UniProtKB/Swiss-Prot annotation:
Alphabetized PANTHER family for the sequence: PYRIMIDINE/PURINE NUCLEOSIDE PHOSPHORYLASE (PTHR36540), PYRIMIDINE_PURINE NUCLEOSIDE PHOSPHORYLASE (PTHR36540:SF1)
Organism name: Cupriavidus taiwanensis (strain DSM 17343 / BCRC 17206 / CCUG 44338 / CIP 107171 / LMG 19424 / R1)
Family (UniProt): Belongs to the nucleoside phosphorylase PpnP family.
Protein name: Pyrimidine/purine nucleoside phosphorylase
GO cellular component terms given for this protein: cytosol
CDD domains, sorted: cupin_PpnP-like
Any Pfam family hit: Ppnp
Record has Glycosyltransferase as a keyword: yes
Assigned keywords, A-Z: Glycosyltransferase, Transferase
EC number assigned by the record: 2.4.2.1, 2.4.2.2
Biological classification of the source: Bacteria, Pseudomonadati, Pseudomonadota, Betaproteobacteria, Burkholderiales
Length: 105
């Protein structure tokens, strides 16, 4: 999944703001109808709910993640990714600004 840029896409101008601005992203729309979000999460402990299944690709920074139903935390950093099932949730702890791409499945 390591791609440095996305070509021939449309970007939604309005930012997605979550958790009082602790997570900020922009939606990228692809010609085949798929979408991704490019964003940052500032230092915080947050819980995200998912509708669609997601793959979170980490571009920069580090985080700890706990998927719904698990007691175990997993650490992720730049160049790594984790998957979240649809209609689920995950907890994320960020100590330094996290740069990510969310791939919706």
């Amino acid at each position: 999944m390591e791609v440095s840029q996305f070509d021939n896409v449309s970007v939604v101008k309005k930012a997605n703001l979550y958790f009082d601005g602790k997570c900020v992203s922009h939606t990228v729309l692809f010609p085949d109808g798929t979408r991704k979000t490019l964003g940052v999460i500032f230092p915080a402990s947050l819980t995200f709910n998912t509708g669609a299944a997601e793959i979170m690709e980490i571009n920069a920074g580090t985080c700890r993640v706990r998927l719904a139903g698990s007691e175990d935390w997993q650490a992720y950093g730049a160049g790594q990714q984790f998957s979240v099932p649809g209609n689920s949730s995950f907890d994320i702890e960020v100590q330094e600004t996290l740069d990510y791409v969310c791939h919706f499945e």
